[in-house]
C-alpha cells in the first residue's frame, strides 16, 4: 500500500510514544524514501509528554538509519478529538490548518499528465451503505 503514496503522516500518541506498528510503518516509509510528517496526537490529554515523544521518535528514526534529510521532517502537534493542530506546542488552539498546510508544503505533488485521460490504479474495493461500492486507489492522471 505504501508504494501508492507520495508521503506519510506518521501519527504518534503524545503519551504512549512510538508503538511497534509505528516502527514497522516508519521503516517501510524510510526504505521507500517517502516524505514523512510526524503528527504528535492527543496533546490535549493531561498526561501528554510531547517533548519526550519527539525525542523517542527521532531516536527511532536514527535506529532505522534515516538520512539527515529524513530526520529533518516537520513535527506537528494535534488533537484529533479537539479538532486542532499546531506548529508549536505553545501556539493557540484553532483548527487543523497547520496539518493541512504542512501536507501541502512537504508532501510532493503527484506526477502525471494533467492533459491525459484520467487513469486510476484501484487497489482496494470497499462498500459503504450510503454510496455503495467504492474503489480506493491512486490517480495517476
Language-model regions, residue ranges each:
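Generic, well-ordered alpha-helical scaffold segments in large soluble proteins
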Residues: 1-4, 8, 28, 56, ...
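Generic detector of short, locally flexible boundary/turn motifs and exposed helical patches
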Residues: 1-4, 40-42, 87-89, 100-102
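Conserved beta-strand/loop subsegment of P-loop NTPase cores
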Residues: 7-11, 32-44, 57-79
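Conserved Switch II/interswitch segment of TRAFAC-class P-loop GTPases
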Residues: 2-52
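Amphipathic alpha-helical segments in well-structured domains
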Residues: 22, 50-57, 96, 100
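Conserved catalytic-core segments of large NTP-driven translation/proteostasis enzymes
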Residues: 62-141
Amino acid at each position: 500500500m505504501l508504494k501508492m503514496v507520495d508521503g506519510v503522516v506518521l501519527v504518534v500518541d503524545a503519551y504512549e510514544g512510538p508503538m511497534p506498528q509505528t516502527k514497522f510503518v516508519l521503516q517501510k516509509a524510510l526504505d521507500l524514501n517517502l516524505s514523512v510528517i510526524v503528527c504528535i496526537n492527543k496533546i490535549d490529554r493531561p498526561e501528554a509528554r510531547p517533548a519526550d515523544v519527539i525525542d523517542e521518535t527521532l531516536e527511532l528514526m536514527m535506529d532505522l538509519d534515516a538520512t539527515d534529510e529524513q530526520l529533518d521532517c516537520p513535527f506537528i502537534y494535534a488533537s484529533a478529538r479537539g479538532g486542532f493542530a499546531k506548529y508549536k506546542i505553545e501556539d493557540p488552539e484553532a483548527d487543523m490548518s497547520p496539518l493541512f498546510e504542512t501536507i501541502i508544503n512537504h508532501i510532493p505533488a503527484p506526477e502525471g499528465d494533467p492533459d491525459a485521460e484520467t487513469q486510476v490504479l484501484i487497489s482496494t474495493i470497499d462498500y459503504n451503505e450510503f454510496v455503495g461500492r467504492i474503489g480506493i486507489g491512486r490517480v495517476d492522471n
